[in-house]
């Protein structure tokens, strides 16, 4: 049996940081950083969030700083 391909055209993900003209990703802005964290507390990859490589590095560093400062958890509670 031949397998059929499914799906159509995928919508391109938009870089949230670039779209909203955010110049500096602040580690104290927890609401912004929570957009880039999974329910388990892990940093979401670029292919999921759609951020550019440059902005992904900014987000990752800000999340790591916020974790060390105690603003974000390292792992989510069940």
Curated annotation (Swiss-Prot):
| The keyword Signal is assigned to this record | no
Q: Which InterPro entries match?
A: Ribosomal_bS18, Ribosomal_bS18_CS, Ribosomal_bS18_sf
Q: Name one GO biological process term.
A: translation
Q: Which Pfam families match?
A: Ribosomal_S18
Q: Name one GO molecular function term.
A: structural constituent of ribosome
The reply to whether Ligase figures as a keyword in the UniProt entry is no
Which superkingdom heads the taxonomic lineage of this protein's source?
Bacteria
**Any single Gene Ontology cellular-component annotation:** cytosolic small ribosomal subunit
Q: Which UniProt keywords apply?
A: Ribonucleoprotein, Ribosomal protein, RNA-binding, rRNA-binding
Role played:
Binds as a heterodimer with protein bS6 to the central domain of the 16S rRNA, where it helps stabilize the platform of the 30S subunit.
Family note: Belongs to the bacterial ribosomal protein bS18 family.
State whether it acts alone or in a complex, and with which partners, per the record.
Part of the 30S ribosomal subunit. Forms a tight heterodimer with protein bS6.
Identification of the protein by name: Small ribosomal subunit protein bS18
Q: Which gene encodes it?
A: rpsR
């Amino acid at each position: 049996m031949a397998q059929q391909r499914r799906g159509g055209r995928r919508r391109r993900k938009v870089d949230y940081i670039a779209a909203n003209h955010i110049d500096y990703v602040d580690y104290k802005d927890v609401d912004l950083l929570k957009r880039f964290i999974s329910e388990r507390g892990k940093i979401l990859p670029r292919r999921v969030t759609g951020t550019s490589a440059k902005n992904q590095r900014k987000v990752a560093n800000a999340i790591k700083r916020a974790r060390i400062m105690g603003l974000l958890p390292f792992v989510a509670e069940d």
